[in-house]
Amino acid sequence: MIPPSSPREDGVDGLPKEAVGAEQPPSPASTSSQESKLQKLKRSLSFKTKSLRSKSADNFFQRTNSEDMKLQAHMVAEISPSSSPLPAPGSLTSTPARAGLHPGGKAHAFQEYIFKKPTFCDVCNHMIVGTNAKHGLRCKACKMSIHHKCTDGLAPQRCMGKLPKGFRRYYSSPLLIHEQFGCIKEVMPIACGNKVDPVYETLRFGTSLAQRTKKGSSGSGSDSPHRTSTSDLVEVPEEANGPGGGYDLRKRSNSVFTYPENGTDDFRDPAKNINHQGSLSKDPLQMNTYVALYKFVPQENEDLEMRPGDIITLLEDSNEDWWKGKIQDRIGFFPANFVQRLQQNEKIFRCVRTFIGCKEQGQITLKENQICVSSEEEQDGFIRVLSGKKKGLIPLDVLENI
């Protein structure tokens, strides 16, 4: 027997059609409109994140992304409170690519790189070398270079990113980025651990020593020869009254421009100095005697003609270049560098033939008819002579006593 039909038909699983209709999700048009709004919001946020690269902007957009996720979750919960065909909020949206690859903008983006120039690892300070090529890892943003084996020992460090071009010219990793490149030192040792380069150490020590010496010499102005000679000149007027005072005055004035040879002064006893000065003052004419080394032809009426070997008595030496002297009864001016002073017990010699000496043996070269003086005795056939600025040994057989 067929049961009677009822105006109320059961739906699926014995539920009424009204209940099934009430549980249906909203229309696809409303869902698509909500998705389009979310996509537009995501595009605007991603565009702003790419345009602004500062740290504050990154933090701002990360906070905005988290608020966006909460807003999306709230909107989806309002759309489907019980069940929804849309995926969960976690799978619906993902963090931006920048935040996914570099969480917080601090991670390095290492890539395989072949180093053409000698490069050192920023972790172990050793050179990146290989059998065939110099393979290693290099950060795409901050250009940090490391070995493959040093990736495990790499401490979590903040990537500074790409620097502006204006700042990149004066970029110095050891001085500006202490957190990332703290292991690099100003003088990087070449595969020698923490040892300092000996060449650098030597140069640094030499520079400091030179600066210290310069400061010390500039500070001790009272030790200069000019100051000492000036104090000596103060006593000159009192000593010029006695005999030989004029010579002593000239002697002291000339000592202003006299410097010790080889850094040594003539240290004598005071008694010896007094005796020496007394002997000089007794015979001032002897100390004012010079011998002509070269021939001088007068250029003016007041000039004094000289021939090699002439004995000249000095009358005035106020001018550095031209002196006034006397030869027998002739008086005139002559070049100061054409004469040689005669000391006591010095003899005058003339070279009879040209002699070429050996500098290694202390000999000098003299031309024919050149004048020289000497006060020493012969030793093994040689005698030490003085001719102008030259001083050395000459064979006695090439000299003639005049």
Swiss-Prot record:
The keyword Metal-binding is annotated on this UniProt entry: yes
Zinc finger boundaries on the chain: Phorbol-ester/DAG-type: 107-159
A GO cellular component annotation in the UniProt record: cytosol
Protein name, per record: SH3 and cysteine-rich domain-containing protein
Gene3D superfamilies xref list: 3.30.60.20, SH3 Domains
PROSITE patterns referenced in this protein's UniProt entry, alphabetically: SH3, ZF_DAG_PE_1, ZF_DAG_PE_2
Region (Disordered): 1-47, 211-247
Function: Promotes expression of the ion channel CACNA1H at the cell membrane, and thereby contributes to the regulation of channel activity. Plays a minor and redundant role in promoting the expression of calcium channel CACNA1S at the cell membrane, and thereby contributes to increased channel activity. Slows down the inactivation rate of the calcium channel CACNA1C.
Start and end residues of each SH3 domain: 285-344, 347-402
Description of how the protein assembles with itself and partners: Interacts (via SH3 domains) with CACNA1S. Interacts with CACNA1H. Interacts with CACNA1C.
Subcellular localization(s) per the UniProt record: Cytoplasm, Cytosol; Cell membrane; Cell membrane, Sarcolemma
UniProt membrane topology term: Peripheral membrane protein
Gene Ontology biological process terms, A to Z: cellular response to heat; positive regulation of cation channel activity; positive regulation of protein localization to plasma membrane; positive regulation of voltage-gated calcium channel activity; signal transduction; skeletal muscle contraction
Keywords: Cell membrane, Cytoplasm, Membrane, Metal-binding, Repeat, SH3 domain, Zinc, Zinc-finger
GO MF: transmembrane transporter binding; zinc ion binding
